[in-house]
UniProtKB/Swiss-Prot annotation:
Annotated glycan sites: N123, N158, N162, N166, N193
Homology family: Belongs to the protein kinase superfamily. Tyr protein kinase family.
Name of the molecule in the record: Tyrosine-protein kinase RYK
Subcellular location: Membrane; Nucleus; Cytoplasm
PANTHER family listed in its UniProt record: TYROSINE-PROTEIN KINASE RECEPTOR, TYROSINE-PROTEIN KINASE RYK
Length: 594
């Protein structure tokens, strides 16, 4: 794959730096070969280590990992580059450090807004020796409460070994949001009069009792009022099906990239240095919603009844070109005539079946077409209408996207010459991934599980806008992507998480796994994952820790995102909102080098 606008390895251009959240993930990876510069030291080395403990990282970031800045004299520039956001309610930071031989230190701070925050305080001296035993020092970051402002803090630590000329400077960047404190309410005249009456032994008890009574009543009323407002807001929020504006604006197509038509697929164990899985939040899915597949329990009459409210007359649909065709299913480019004004027309996709389709196949098409029904988001493509008239083959109508199926589009891009202006760049591919992650993040918030996320179940238009659609007819149109493992059900084995393969369990976490494979599809321009692996061996293969290898010219930071999605434990996979943030930051970093 030739590098487009992204400046990837092998392109000869500048390489974009990893975004902040990826820097943190990379900093927590197990150390491989010592590529980071070491502390200036004597030949034996002082063996200095400085890090945030697992408890401290969990308190600040919610991650179960230690964050090393220096490990046995090796400096982690990934970790030092991360500008850590300190929660506004957190006033203390704790650093763990030690050295095996004499190392002198000098500690200093810089704050960009002294009105919002005073100079940080520490419980150690400003200069001295790094302790020889494992020790913790505390940094206090207390706001003044005078203004609302984000404060940037720089902690500079100079480490000196053996002589004053032999030193290393470490800069730790932090930022914290400080808020203005509410002013205390001044005592009113009524309060003053009341304060004088409390010395009256006759009226003291009744007056205090009355005040407490009225205050209690007022507080109760206020609480009831607030609860009512909150319930009303939550109800309105759940009823509104608004499009969430959490995807970034589309980036334009630029200099193209092409990829060789063949690529030798390699597979790596998850614990090898080039395929290590970064640590992610263990609390990513506090309550996993697990579903079992029960489509075969629905009858054709029940399936038609569920879509009766969006049924339209067959006369309003005109079928044009056949876009895709399988054994029993077809997708047409269609025209939908407006019900009130026959002169108004809309272009549509029309999914339907051939005459030889069985009742089970028709039922499955209707049922799976309803997967995204009623959901509204710019990166989702739910059905809008159906035609279920007697004597006619059922039809499912969806909005039209003029570049069609994403998988077919990617494979077409692979055949395009490198100098073709319509070829897409790496930045465009990342932008597509962001859009898919945004749509899936919306589904996760609505507790909707897709079960079959893949490039084949997405569509794209000429502005490179991508939308996720259902998987109706996908088994028929992409038969090589589905396999039956002896249970009489065709499943997308190569896209499925281990718990889905073994226990037929699906959740938002299993959708995250499929997203990682979809991201791999994007970076390989539509290649098939695990193409050399027997579908019956996939579960054992994944259990042993093997994963698909890093695509050619795929940046390490982007492959780290994929690896996060393929953690065996569903709880350790990132949430879609975290993936949106990671990919958006990486997309911005690519754009900075265009």
């Amino acid at each position: 794959m030739r590098a487009g606008r992204g400046g990837v390895p092998g392109s000869g251009g500048l390489r974009a730096p990893p975004p902040p959240l990826l820097l943190l993930l990379l900093a927590m990876l197990p150390a491989a070969a010592p590529r980071s510069p070491a502390l200036a030291a004597a030949p034996a080395g002082p063996s200095v280590s400085l890090y945030l403990s697992e408890d401290e990282v969990r308190r600040l970031l919610g991650l179960d990992a230690e964050l090393y800045y220096v490990r046995n004299d090796l400096i982690s520039h990934y970790a030092l580059s991360f500008n850590l956001l300190v929660p506004s309610e957190t006033n203390f930071l704790h650093f763990t450090w030690h050295a095996k031989s004499k190392v002198e230190y000098k500690l200093g701070f810089q704050v960009d807004n002294f009105v919002a925050m005073g100079m940080p305080q520490v419980n150690i001296s400003a200069q001295g020796e790094v302790p020889r035993t494992l020790s913790v020092f505390r940094v206090e970051l207390s706001c003044t409460g005078k203004v609302d402002s984000e404060v940037m803090i720089l902690m500079q630590l100079n480490l000196t070994v053996n002589s004053s000329k032999n030193f290393t400077v470490l800069n730790f960047k932090r930022r914290k949001m400080c808020y203005k404190k509410l002013e205390e309410v001044k005592t009113s005249a009524l309060d003053k009069n009341t304060s004088r009456t409390i010395y009256d032994p006759v009226h003291a008890a009744p007056t205090t009792s009355t005040r407490v009574f009225y205050i209690s009543v007022g507080v109760c009323c206020a609480v009831i009022f607030l609860v009512a407002i909150i319930l009303a807001v939550l109800h309105l929020h759940s009823m509104k099906r608004i499009e969430l504006d959490d995807s970034i604006s589309a980036s334009s197509s630029s200099q193209g990239l092409s990829q060789p038509s063949t690529q030798t697929t390699q597979y790596l164990r998850a614990d090898t240095p080039n395929n290590a899985t970064p640590i992610t939040s263990s609390s990513g899915y506090p309550t996993l919603r697990i579903e079992k597949n029960d489509l075969r329990s629905v009858t054709l009459l029940e399936a038609k009844a569920k879509v009766k409210d969006i049924a339209i007359s067959r006369e309003r649909i005109t079928l044009k070109d056949v876009l895709q065709e399988g054994t029993f299913g077809r997708i047409f480019h269609g025209i939908l005539v407006d019900e009130k004004d026959p002169n108004k027309e809309k272009q549509t996709f029309v999914k339907t079946v051939k005459d030889q389709a069985s009742e089970v196949q028709v039922t499955m098409m209707l049922t799976e077409s309803c997967k995204l029904r009623g959901l509204h988001h710019r990166n989702l493509l739910p059905i809008t209408h159906v035609c279920i008239e007697e004597g006619e083959k059922p039809m499912v109508v969806l909005p039209y996207m003029n570049w069609g199926n994403l998988k077919l589009f990617l494979r077409q891009c692979k055949l395009v010459e490198a100098n073709n202006p319509q070829a897409i760049s790496q930045q465009d591919l990342v932008h597509m991934a962001i859009q898919i992650a945004c749509g899936m993040s919306y589904l996760a918030r609505r507790e909707v599980i897709h079960r079959d996320l893949a490039a084949r179940n997405c569509v794209i238009d000429d502005t490179l806008q991508v939308k996720i659609t259902d998987n109706a007819l996908s088994r028929d149109l992409f038969p090589m992507d589905y396999h039956c493992l002896g249970d009489n059900e065709n499943r997308p084995v190569r896209w499925m998480a281990l718990e889905s393969l073994v226990n037929n369990e699906f959740s938002s976490a299993s959708d995250v796994w499929a997203f990682g494979v979809t991201l791999w599809e994007l970076m390989t321009l539509g290649q098939t994952p695990y193409v050399d692996i027997d579908p019956f061996e996939m579960a054992a293969y994944l259990k042993d820790g093997y994963r698909i290898a890093q695509p050619i010219n795929c940046p390490d930071e982007l492959f780290a995102v994929m690896a996060c999605c393929w953690a065996l434990d569903p709880e350790e996979r990132p949430k879609f909102q975290q993936l949106v943030q990671c990919l958006t930051e990486f997309h911005a970093a690519l754009g900075a080098y265009v």
